[in-house]
Amino acid sequence: MHIEARLFEFVAVFFVIMAVLYGVLTSMFATGGVDWVGTTALALTGGLALIVATFFRFVARRLDIRPEDYEGAEISDGAGELGFFSPHSWWPVLVALSGSVAAVGIALWLPWLIVAGVVFVLASAAGLVFEYYVGPEKH
C-alpha cells in the first residue's frame, strides 16, 4: 500500500498547489475577485486525497509487504487466491441503472422518480449482496 499512499500524497499536494495558484490567479485576473467556490473545491479535493493517503499509510503499516511494494518481486509472487468474483452476475448492471434513475430524478427534481430510484437501488443492492445466499436450486 506504500505505492498507493505515495500516489494519493502526490495528488493531495498537486491539488493544494493548484488551489493556491487558482486563488491567486483569479484574484489578479477575474473581475469579481477570488473565485471562492473553485478555490474551496480544489482545496477540499486536496484534503480528501490526503485523507485517503493517510488511510493507505496506516493500512500499509499493518499489512505485510506485498509483491507490489517489493521492487525485486516476480509476477509469480502475486499468484494465488485473490477473492471471489461472479462474472455472470447481472446485479451490478441493475445497481447502476437504478442509481442512474435516482440521479435523473434528483437532476429533474421529480420526487416520484427519486423514490422509485431509491427503492430500485435498495432492491438491486440487496440482490447483489444476497445473490449467493439462496439455495442452489434457485440459480
Swiss-Prot record:
InterPro entries: Cyt_c_oxidase_su4_actinobac (IPR021050). Coiled coil: none annotated. Keywords: Cell membrane, Membrane, Translocase, Transmembrane, Transmembrane helix. Associates with subunits I, II and III to form cytochrome c oxidase. This is Probable cytochrome c oxidase polypeptide 4. It is found in: Cell membrane. GO terms for molecular function: cytochrome-c oxidase activity. GO terms for biological process: electron transport chain. GO terms for cellular component: plasma membrane. The chain crosses the membrane at residues 10-30, 36-56, 79-99, 101-121. Belongs to the cytochrome c oxidase bacterial subunit CtaF family. It is an enzyme of class 7 (translocase). Its EC number is 7.1.1.9. Part of cytochrome c oxidase, its function is unknown. Its main location: membrane. It is a multi-pass membrane protein. The keyword Membrane applies. The keyword Secreted does not apply. The lineage of its organism: Bacteria, Bacillati, Actinomycetota, Actinomycetes, Mycobacteriales. It catalyses: 4 Fe(II)-[cytochrome c] + O2 + 8 H(+)(in) = 4 Fe(III)-[cytochrome c] + 2 H2O + 4 H(+)(out).
